[in-house]
């Protein structure tokens, strides 16, 4: 209940936030804080961690309050249920479910929930092994009958009241003019990264179904510009927590923990030959990065959080200039940047990004009239503004290939 109460509390108390939601049509995508902080490995078969199996609870609350308006490729909701599991048996039985009618090939994997009151609390003291003994990430092997599933491994203990869920696929796309927008899910089908082997083949943030959908859709589109909405940074590591507690031994929220998949995406985007803009967040800084001539990253950090310190939290990347972390060098054209001598509560420099697509120029035959003429090469202008003063801090204009 606490997750839903959080949304209600912020909307009740945040009058300006409520007005925004009431008056401005918006699309949203979720990251870890919409579920639970640092939620990793939701698709890592056999993983046991209280944050990991909180995925569907947090995702359902997000859909109830924000995600209901989003375009989605698959519409079947999360399935929640109570089931029976028997020790050493790989069967899960739910008398109230009809698994034969569920489009399981279009849904996620199965999680048995942690079951403690603190399961969704952002506090590392609860990252222990006190949860339900059968709480793991499970692959569904087959439907035995309408009420029974075979899972990839047997239960650890007998339990006649297992709280479980089968996830949904939360990605989708929409088209506005000559721009295609792809809203990807970076948490729901995410395998477990390993910062000691960032280029491990096959480790995926998206999962095979989503990755194949994304690349197929992007190749089939005739849009001039493709916007990929990713909740986590593409080129800059998120390797610190800004002074908060974190799993320092394996901390990285970004695509820099998934080099194999990231580089495969870039290679396929280069084949398309059109502009691809990866719109990212999560890090508490903003930046504009040229990855290739066609692929760019534009990150906008949160508006109400202290900034990260790049020296500590972003693998000591520069404010501008060439930066290489892993197999690919990129060009940081601009960024917000905080020096480490600032006290934590002085690190409050938000920026917001306004994206303007210029397809036509105004050219009336008579002054005051109306006529629009198409540009031979449309352009997209990314404008970063200081969140405190409203002043323009940086702009980057990118046109179609000439």
Q: What are these language model-derived features?
A:
Residues 1-402:
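Long, structured stretches of catalytic cores involved in phosphate-ester chemistry, encompassing
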């Amino acid at each position: 209940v606490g997750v839903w109460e959080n949304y209600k509390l912020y909307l009740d108390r945040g009058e300006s936030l409520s007005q925004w939601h009431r008056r401005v049509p918006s699309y949203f995508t979720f990251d870890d804080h919409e579920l639970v902080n640092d939620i990793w490995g939701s698709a890592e078969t056999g993983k046991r961690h209280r944050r990991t199996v909180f995925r569907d609870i947090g995702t359902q609350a997000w859909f109830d309050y924000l995600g209901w308006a989003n375009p989605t490729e698959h519409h079947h909701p999360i399935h929640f249920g109570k089931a029976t599991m028997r020790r050493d048996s790989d069967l899960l039985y739910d008398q109230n479910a009809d698994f034969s009618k569920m489009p399981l090939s279009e849904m996620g994997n199965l999680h048995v929930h942690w079951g403690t009151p603190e399961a969704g609390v952002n506090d590392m003291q609860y990252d222990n092994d006190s949860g339900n003994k059968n709480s793991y990430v499970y692959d569904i092997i087959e439907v035995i009958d309408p009420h029974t599933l075979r899972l990839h491994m047997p239960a650890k203990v007998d339990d006649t009241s297992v709280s479980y869920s089968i996830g949904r696929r939360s990605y989708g796309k929409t088209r506005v003019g000559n721009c295609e927008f792809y809203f990807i899910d970076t948490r729901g089908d995410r395998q477990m990264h390993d910062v000691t082997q960032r280029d491990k083949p096959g480790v995926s943030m998206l999962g095979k179904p989503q990755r194949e959908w994304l690349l197929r859709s992007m190749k089939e589109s005739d849009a001039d510009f493709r916007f990929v909405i990713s909740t986590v940074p593409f080129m800059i590591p998120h390797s610190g927590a800004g002074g908060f507690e974190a799993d320092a031994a394996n901390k990285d929220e970004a695509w820099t923990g998934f080099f194999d998949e990231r580089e495969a995406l870039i290679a396929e985007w280069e084949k398309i030959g059109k502009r691809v803009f990866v719109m990212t967040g999560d890090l508490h800084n903003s930046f504009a990065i040229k990855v290739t001539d066609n692929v760019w990253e534009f990150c906008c950090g949160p508006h109400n959080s202290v900034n990260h310190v790049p020296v500590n939290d972003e693998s000591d990347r520069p404010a501008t200039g060439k930066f290489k972390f892993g197999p690919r060098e990129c060009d940081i054209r601009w960024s917000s940047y905080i020096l480490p001598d600032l006290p934590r509560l002085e690190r409050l420099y938000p920026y917001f990004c306004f994206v303007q697509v210029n397809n036509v120029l105004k050219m009336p035959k008579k002054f005051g009239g109306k006529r629009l003429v198409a540009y031979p090469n449309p352009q997209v202008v990314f404008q970063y503004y200081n969140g405190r003063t409203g002043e323009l801090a940086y702009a980057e204009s990118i046109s179609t290939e000439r």
